[in-house]
Amino acid sequence: MSYTLPSLPYAYDALEPHFDKQTMEIHHTKHHQTYVNNANAALESLPEFANLPVEELITKLDQLPADKKTVLRNNAGGHANHSLFWKGLKKGTTLQGDLKAAIERDFGSVDNFKAEFEKAAASRFGSGWAWLVLKGDKLAVVSTANQDSPLMGEAISGASGFPIMGLDVWEHAYYLKFQNRRPDYIKEFWNVVNWDEAAARFAAKK
């Protein structure tokens, strides 16, 4: 089984004016496609791993041959992270229900959660991601470098937990529109969070 680039459930301009069409198209068809291609190439000689869903593969990095571990950490990680990212974007959804209640319980308020998430995203040096994760029965905000995922575990990524939502803070995710203004990009994210997807992921794991 080869990994394939997932189709987006919306047009490239669907998130305007918050996330621009050009960035979305390049990000999806160029950057994400490259992660898919590189992961598939690395897996050609690893048939015992090639049929695993990418979310499962990245939990087994310590089982990979040493010469494949880094390339798959980066590229299978990139494929998994971006696949989640695209599904997590949609205009016009509302934070409500069990997920909202859990955020208020674990962060004190929605505003406190947003402030903590924005800080994690803005302070991640270089390239990486900010995440809302479920650890056991508690929500937490974490960040990872490069294309690391919380699914890789603390020993590899420095974070753990089941991702509920994530924000890509690589420059390729925002530079065409926001240049070096990462905090502005992070603020715009709240206008396109797919809270329905986040709630579904939370409900599946709580």
Swiss-Prot record:
Name of the protein described by the UniProt record: Superoxide dismutase [Mn]
Cofactor binding mode and count: Binds 1 Mn(2+) ion per subunit.
NCBIfam families tied to this protein: PRK10925.1
Top-rank lineage group of the source organism: Bacteria
Function noted in UniProt: Destroys superoxide anion radicals which are normally produced within the cells and which are toxic to biological systems.
Its EC number(s): 1.15.1.1
A Pfam family: Sod_Fe_C
Keywords: Manganese, Metal-binding, Oxidoreductase
SS bond partners: none
